Amino acid sequence: MLIKLLTKVFGSRNDRTLRRMRKAVSLINAMEPEMEKLSDDELKAKTNEFRARIEKGESVESLIPEAFAVVREASKRVFGMRHFDVQLLGGMVLNDRCIAEMRTGEGKTLTATLPAYLNALSGKGVHVVTVNDYLAQRDAENNRPLFEFLGMSVGINLPGMPAPAKREAYAADITYGTNNEYGFDYLRDNMAFSPEERVQRKLHYALVDEVDSILIDEARTPLIISGPAEDSSEMYKKVNKIIPHLIRQEKEDSDTFQGEGHFSVDEKARQVNLTERGLVLIEELLVQEGIMDEGESLYSPGNIMLMHHVTAALRAHALFTRDVDYIVKDGEVIIVDEHTGRTMQGRRWSDGLHQAVEAKEGVEIQNENQTLASITFQNYFRLYEKLAGMTGTADTEAFEFSSIYKLDTVVVPTNRPMIRKDLPDLVYMTEAEKIQAIIEDIKERTANGQPVLVGTISIEKSEVVSRELTKAGIKHNVLNAKFHANEAGIVAQAGYPAAVTIATNMAGRGTDIMLGGSWQAEVAALEAPTEEQIAQIKADWQVRHDAVLAAGGLHIIGTERHESRRIDNQLRGRSGRQGDPGSSRFYLSMEDALMRIFASDRVSGMMRKLGMKPGEAIEHPWVTKAIANAQRKVESRNFDIRKQLLEYDDVANDQRRAIYTQRNELLDVSDVSDTINSIREDVFKATIDAYIPPQSLEEMWDIPGLQERLKNDFDLELPIAEWLDKEPELHEETLRERILAQSIEVYQRKEEVVGAEMMRHFEKGVMLQTLDSLWKEHLAAMDYLRQGIHLRGYAQKDPKQEYKRESFAMFAAMLESLKYEVISTLSKVQVRMPEEVEAMEMQRREEAERLAQMQQLSHQDDDTAVAADLAAQTGERKIGRNDPCPCGSGKKYKQCHGRLS
């Protein structure tokens, strides 16, 4: 009450922000007459004038009124479209490192041209990020004429493009692409073998469209580049045969409870666990199949990989459903994105889950993959100096944007007031009753000529509704992952009078639904339309448009509530754009997933006691409130999962930054001999220490062991025992110096054979190859550590702190291994001719190319995320030699991981 009163007196933070920005809007409007007087050439010349002013030290922010006025005038001349005042406000919000919440149909694409132009003036590049390739291409092509009129270059970054084309796209002033492609390019750049192979520039400004979808919905799933590991397809087939013998444990209070089952399913956490009874049975079955020896336990250390196979197979059978989580097409299991309902061609679940699903479906099992590089979207987008985003629905997630990305959310007012009617939810007892009620509503609406959009949460549900509509003889279009190609066309015509469109999880975001259909799509379908044809099409469209307005605009039907209120709001937001009329209603049943998991059994009990008849529905604000509370529970759980994932990934992120910084420094220099000499000293000191402890008596020295180690690991045959016999005065310090000097001398003789330049090239290649190989193994070890770390909680230890401590110890050990491997390889490889170095280089490149072709780009299903409380690092700054090392050891960078560089 008090907060409401204070808000009325002082205005909310949102109001104060907009009030401040409206002053700048008045300035832009005042400049309009002046801009209109400029010729095209004078308007174009403004870009170079702004660039010159920035070079002289003027800030980008000081140019806002003038730059925005220039873009608005250019848009009027190129597109015949003038930015509304609310779009200017949106542009300022986006430049202010904030998230602009703009309703559907308010022209987000045109709004984005303002901050994109302004931030591209510095010449550092702007990345516009979209959710799919179609939108990236569409927005780039639509806005290209405007940017090129103003002297700006536009690039498109698409999957599968060759490196030179990608480099050109990134070199443009403004680059359009998808979140996945930007992330994968970053990872690939950090796997490159020469500076020329890298495609990205320094990450400057990212403008994220549908920011909620990218930074929240997809933030639980890291981007992973993986390569093939060993073949274990037979094991998946054998384990898959066993799983159908197991019975699922039902809840004790359920109607179907039959005592203890063999495994329990936690739908909330998406986990499956064996019960005591299940463990006994599965061990018997594994012994029968000859997979495990009698008397062995599934939990013994030697059966860790077998346990991994059993868990993956159980999850595949109990948690992943065909046509909901994946589809089978042409003998291949293709993942369906749970957030967009689109198929994700070429993506694979990791941890053996994809292979287990392939075994379950009886299709060919493809090899398991090993992680080569990975990053989460949270950590990728925080590398940008400046980040902003826009969406129609961000306010419900404002806290998460603020706490994780340090982005404030500003709600931008609509150009015209919103008049859509959002009707209360209707709750039915069963799914069948609900579907029947939906069909009746559709019949009623379409009889009046009103278009209807039906939103479903899975392909399976969309096909159920489609079948019922077909039975009822109602013509309709289905829009889901299976009919991806003609998506935009179907959405564009969804506003036709009496049109019925079924869409999964609002596939088709980014395309406006025009009331009366899209006359532009009709014109585009004609080969060479005449003026008369275009005029006729527009006239016909106007008649249809008016008819739909009279019928009440677009009606939205939700077939069930999503886990997130935001996705429900996105569905509703398809109607009522730009002040158009419209309506929306959600139909629910007690059999819906959300109601089953989160709405208590008391609700269904209460409905039965009230004596509800079949086909009757409850419609009450209390019910709507209870559902909103259930959604809040899911949202906060999902937020905790993402926060957990981020905290854990922050530990890995600091290590990743240290390795990638080091790797890039290595790539950019041609001579690493100083580094090699420095680490040779460290390696030989550690090796000698193992056999001659410092300040020890000669009786404690293990000279035969040292000689053998030097010969085996460094190809160095030294008569150390002979030296000690012949020179009694030879003490420990002098001996150490002599061994090191001998190793340097042998190495220099090798260098004389091939020449200094070729040797430098060889050293760099060996360092890169060894670093990549050990980093890959380290990532796998970190994965295994993370999967089991939560068990430390049972020992009264904080899993997060344990993960930090152990991963740092592993990282330090990896760096020691790196030094040792590099010196050992350089010492052992016999190079006699320069051609041999070239041949080895060629072999390395061929291997890298072979791996690149076999690489899988995946979005891991990471529900077991865990994590560390480290401050967010913004921008990929260069680490100073005296700065604290980012790995968290507390040492200076030069004394820790900086020693390698």
Curated annotation (Swiss-Prot):
EC numbers: 7.4.2.8
Protein task: Part of the Sec protein translocase complex. Interacts with the SecYEG preprotein conducting channel. Has a central role in coupling the hydrolysis of ATP to the transfer of proteins into and across the cell membrane, serving both as a receptor for the preprotein-SecB complex and as an ATP-driven molecular motor driving the stepwise translocation of polypeptide chains across the membrane.
Sorted UniProt keywords: ATP-binding, Cell inner membrane, Cell membrane, Cytoplasm, Membrane, Metal-binding, Nucleotide-binding, Protein transport, Translocase, Translocation, Transport, Zinc
EC main group: translocase
Gene Ontology BP, a term: protein import
Family according to the record: Belongs to the SecA family.
Induction (UniProt): Repressed under conditions of excess protein secretion capacity and derepressed when protein secretion becomes limiting. This is regulated by SecM.
Cofactor binding annotation: May bind 1 zinc ion per subunit.
Stored CDD domains: DEXDc_SecA, SF2_C_secA
Protein name: Protein translocase subunit SecA
Catalytic activities: ATP + H2O + cellular proteinSide 1 = ADP + phosphate + cellular proteinSide 2
Cofactors demanded by this protein: Zn(2+)
Quaternary structure and partners: Monomer and homodimer. Part of the essential Sec protein translocation apparatus which comprises SecA, SecYEG and auxiliary proteins SecDF-YajC and YidC.
UniProt keyword annotation of Magnesium present: no
Binding, Zn(2+): 885, 887, 896-897
Record membrane topology: Peripheral membrane protein
Cross-referenced InterPro entries: Helicase_ATP-bd (IPR014001), P-loop_NTPase (IPR027417), SEC_C_motif (IPR004027), SecA (IPR000185), SecA_CS (IPR020937), SecA_DEAD (IPR011115), SecA_motor_DEAD (IPR014018), SecA_preprotein_X-link_dom (IPR011130)
GO terms of molecular function: ATP binding; metal ion binding; protein-exporting ATPase activity
Keyword rRNA-binding found: no
Gene Ontology cellular component annotations, sorted alphabetically: cell envelope Sec protein transport complex; cytosol; plasma membrane
